Every structure is written in C-alpha cells, then in structure tokens.
Amino acid sequence: MEVCNCIEPQWPADELLMKYQYISDFFIAVAYFSIPLELIYFVKKSAVFPYRWVLVQFGAFIVLCGATHLINLWTFTTHSRTVALVMTTAKVLTAVVSCATALMLVHIIPDLLSVKTRELFLKNKAAELDREMGLIRTQEETGRHVRMLTHEIRSTLDRHTILKTTLVELGRTLALEECALWMPTRTGLELQLSYTLRQQHPVEYTVPIQLPVINQVFGTSRAVKISPNSPVARLRPVSGKYLLGEVVAVRVPLLHLSNFQINDWPELSTKRYALMVLMLPSDSARQWHVHELELVEVVADQVAVALSHAAILEESMRARDLLMEQNVALDIARREAETAIRARNDFLAVMNHEMRTPMHAIIALSSLLQETELTPEQRLMVETVLKSSSLLATLMNDVLDLSRLEDGSLQLELGTFNLHTLFREVLNLIKPIAVVKKLPITLNLAPDLPEFVVGDEKRLMQIILNIVGNAVKFSKQGSISVTALVTKSDNRAPPDFFVVPTGSHFYLRVKVKDLGAGINPQDIPKLFTKFAQTQSLATRSSGGSGLGLAISKRFVNLMEGNIWIESEGVGKGCTAIFDVKLAISNESKQSGIPKVPANPQHVNFAGLKVLVMDENGVSRMVTKGLLVHLGCEVTTVSSNEECLRVVSHEHRVVFMDVCTPGVENYQIALRIHEKFTKRHQRPLLVALTGNTDKSTKEKCMSFGLDGVLLKPVSLDNMRNVLSDRLEHRVLYEAM
C-alpha cells in the first residue's frame, strides 16, 4: 500500500497563510542580514567604539536568526531530511549564540546605562573648564593691562607725571567716570586732593585722616568698596543722576626714604599712605569685578614703587644741582685764592727786592764800619745795627720760604753731602752764642749713621739750626745735647707716623734736648702754627717771629718725616725730635757745593780788577765800597750796554745785578760769552740778586753765569765769594 507524504490543505486559506509566512520569513532574513552589515559599516567609520567583540557576538546572533528564517522557507513545503538537519543545526547555533549574547548583555547594559551619567559629568567638566578658561583669559587681560600701566608709569621718573599718567591710564582701561588721588599733608593729619582725572587743577580740598572710611581703607592692602557719598568720593556732580556708580578706594604706600629729605613729602616717622579713589560711571548697572579690583591693587603697588624712585631721583638731582653750585662756588673761591696767592707772592717778591736793596746798603756799610776804628759805644751801636739787619734779613727769608711752602712752589734740591760734617757746621755756628750764655753743647752721632747721604742739605741744616737755635735761645742754664741716629721700626714715634726704611733709604732721627724754660703741654700744638706766640716761651721777648718751627715742620713734611716736641712742663726743659727720609749715597767723597776757604782773611785781593753793573746807584756804591775795602780795583757801570762796552779781559770778576724783571740782564751774560770766545780770557760772571726763588738760580745757570750772590751782602760774604773766585770754582750760594 502506497503512503503519501503530501499534506493536503484542510481549508483554502491555509495556502494564503503559508504565502504570507513565506514572504515574512524572507524579509525577516533580509533584515537580519542587513543589520550586521550596517553595524559593521558604522563601526568601521567610528574609531572609538569600545565593544567590538560584543558586536561580533551580536552580529553572529542576528545572522543566525536570519539564517533560520531563510532556511524556514524550505520547510513550508515537503522537504528533505537534509533541510531538516540544516534547520536544526541553525536553530541550535542560534540558541547558543543568543544565550551567550544574553549573558554578555548582563555586563554591557550597566556600562551603556552609565553613558548618560558620564555625559552629564563631561558637560559639568566642560562648563568648569570654560569657567577656568574665562578666568585665565581675565587674568591674562588683567596682566596685560598691568604691564601696560606699569610701562606707562615707569616711562618717566617725574612724580607729577607718574600720578597723572596713572589716573589717565586707569580711567581709560577701566572706563571710569572719575579717578582721584589724595596725598597726606606735611603734618600727616589730613589728606589733600592732589590729582583728579577730569580736573586739570583740582580745588585744594582736605579731609581729616582719622575718618572711619579712611581708616578702613588704610587698614588693608586690598581694594575696598566705599559709599559714593563718602567725603573722599564727592568729586562728581550728582544733579540729574538717578544712581551713582560704585566706588572703590585703595591705599598707596609711601615708601620710607631714610637717607633723603624730599620737598612736599610727608614726615615718614610712621608709615604713611596716599589714597586712590576710583568711580564707575553713574546711571549704569556695572559693578566691580574681582579681576578689576586686583588690577587696581597691583597698580597701587607699582605707583608706590615708582613714586619712591621718582622721589629718590628728584632728591638726587637736587643734591646734584646743589653740588654743582657748591663746585662753582668752590671753583670761584679757588680762583680767588689763587689770585690772592699770586698777588701775595708778587707783593712779597716786590717787597723782597725793595727791602733787600736798602738792606744791602745797611749790612754792607755796617760791616765796613766794623773794620774801622770805633769807640766802644760806637762799636756797640754798629753791632746792634748789623745784628738787627741780619735778623730782618732772616725774617724776610722765613716769610718767603713759608709763602712758597704754602703754595707748593718750593721744592727740595737733592744732592749728595756729608751728614757728619753738616752737624759739625751747625755746632760751629751755634757754639759762639752758647759760649756767651755759658751753655755746653754736646753732639752724639750714632756709629751706624751713614756719612754720605742724598737729600736737601740746605733745608736739613735750616731745620737743625732752627731747633738748636731755639734750645739755646730759651735756655738760661743747664746743657744742650744733640743726638743723631738711624730710626728703627721699633723706635718710639707718634701713633700716626710709621717708619718704613728700605734698602736705599733710611730715616734720620735728630733729638735736641735742653734743660731750659720748658713748655706747658697745652701750648705744644701751638708751636707749629705760624706767627703763634706762647706765653710759656715768651717768644716776642726773645726776639722770635714764630715762624721757625712752622717752617721746620713743613720742611720735615716735604722730607716725608715727622716732628714733635716733648716737655713735662714749664721749667723742666723740653726735647725736640724729628725724623726725615734720606737716601744712602755710595760716594766716598762729597760732590756737592764747594766750601769757602777756612781762612779767607789771608787771601790778598790787592789789584784784583772787578766790574760792577747795577742800575741802583746806592747798591752800586755799596758794592764798590765793599770791594775797595778788600783792595780791589773797581769799575762801576749803570747799564747793560755800558757794561758790554767797558768789560775787558783785564777784569777778573763781573758782578751783575739781575733783580729787574725780564731777561735783558741775563742776555748780557750771553753777549759777554760771545765777546770772549776763550774761557780763560772771559771774566767770571756773578749775579747779584735779591730774589731767593729757585727759578732765578736756574735762569742764571741757563744763561751761563758762574755764580749767584744774594743781597744783602756783608763784608765777610764778599770776601768769601772773591776767595772762591780766586780758587776758580763756580759758586751758587744756597737759595
């Protein structure tokens, strides 16, 4: 019996339903297959999708679902076992993948639900970042304004310009209606309206500094909002205004300038502040923002620094101007002093010349009178005249020396000399006076004292003569000792003087001790003051001028030394000590100025022909008298031309007066040299001058004169000069 596997439709609508199922499964399969393709496409387009492996599972699930619907198309009709097997396999796989996907969704769905939370978080974070960016932009804008304002403020160091610039730039930057600066008064008890933005010349309006609103602002470094009706904020008209703009105030520190006194600057014994008031426009809803207040605070600090710099510069410029004025005054005073010194020197030079000419006559004639037969009374008068004249000549020399020491024109004349001989010569000059006063003098020379040294022999001798002479002058009894030694580093000396000997130099120490009148210790500093007279010394009664020690001190200073006096009091004697710097000489014999013969009185001048040229008739007569008394045959002339005409080889010596200014009298020496080409035929040329300055001696040497003789000249001086001429030696008397 044949079995039929065909399913016969039980009713006609079944076929229609089958067709609908067939079509539905087809479209379901198409949809299932298209969904993974769409997912794959969009996932590839997105680089941030985090669940790719989940998408693979979900895609497999959809594909398998679509496959079951597609396979199901073949099950609506009679189908083979293979189709049933495929259908079963597809459904099993679909079930497995569906379960796996369902299990995976348990973990995925919470993450998907948290996406909204993350979205809200990101939105909040973005809003916060926007706020921070706005703050950064605000700070950057504030910083830019601060830099701009600081540059404008620092572009000048004028105090008024700084303040006006600050107000203008703040008003422009912050769009202010008004801006003002209140400065403390000199007393610091009030604030005065000094600068405003809208008014070029504000009314001098003051408010007490103790107002509560001012104390509130001065109590903090921050900008403070104050009432628009505050006394310091009433700077704008209020008529027609419905709403006054907000007002802030900030303090401006006035830095303490301890080393300066600034005009119009308050006394800063306590910390003081200025007050800056800033006003927003009226009838507006604008308010102060935090960054604007910070800008105001920073600008206030910058203004404080700029004001301090300006104040310092202002005072420095004032000090500079004052210093320039003082320099001008000092320069004028210096020029006046130099003019006065030149006038004094010119006066002294003229007086020296004018006084030495009559002094020459007095001393020369007095010395001639001494050689004649005189009664004791006459001889005493002549000796008194001669002694007084010599004292006057010494005083003139001292005044000239002091003048040249003070203006710095006197320089040391260095040369090699015998130091031991110098001390013996000083004693030979002083002993006659000491013998009369019955004062024994002893000389102690240290064994290590160099014999030949380099220094200014004349000035050193002058110092020693002054000090030893004072010891003899002010001692009525006792003894005098003169000690010379080489100063050692450990020798006692004043605290401000240090001896530093070297291999080529040493310091000579001379100590002159006497048992005379002594000195009051309070009077010792006065001894080195020119023209000073101490009652303990009774200088005037002793015939002194008060110049000796003052000149000696200056000479010692020129020799890089020091001088001081020690005494225990009146009646106990005193000790004068000085150190001078000398150079050590390697010469075995002195090459300095030759000395006159020991006994010039024994030289015979009879028949010695001498020519005297002097424009002054009295001086010419006196010089002739001295020479005639010595036995010379004298010819006198009164002019250079006459001298040049008369001079001949028979004349052994020509005395020429060169006291007149100019070089005419020096030129005659050159013409005499030209006239006598052979030296042994030319007479020796000796200058007669009353000028003691070094330039006269140098000029005489440069014009070929053989010697210089200073007026006034005594008979002994003339005898010594002529004896030296006969020895054929060039003589330049120490000047």
Swiss-Prot record:
Its cofactor is Cu cation. Residues 350-586 form the Histidine kinase domain. It comes from the Eukaryota. Its EC number is 2.7.13.3. Residues 158-307 form the GAF domain. It is found in: Endoplasmic reticulum membrane. InterPro entries: CheY-like_superfamily, ETR, GAF, GAF-like_dom_sf, HATPase_C_sf, His_kinase_dom, HisK_dim/P_dom, HisK_dim/P_sf. It is a multi-pass membrane protein. The modification 4-aspartylphosphate is found at D657. Residues 609-726 form the Response regulatory domain. One of its GO terms (biological process) is defense response to bacterium. There is a cross-link at K711 (Glycyl lysine isopeptide (Lys-Gly) (interchain with G-Cter in ubiquitin)). It catalyses: ATP + protein L-histidine = ADP + protein N-phospho-L-histidine. Its main location: endoplasmic reticulum. PROSITE patterns: HIS_KIN, RESPONSE_REGULATORY. Activation probably requires a transfer of a phosphate group between a His in the transmitter domain and an Asp of the receiver domain. The modification Phosphohistidine is found at H353. Signal peptide: none annotated. May act early in the ethylene signal transduction pathway, possibly as an ethylene receptor, or as a regulator of the pathway. Belongs to the ethylene receptor family. This is Ethylene receptor 1.
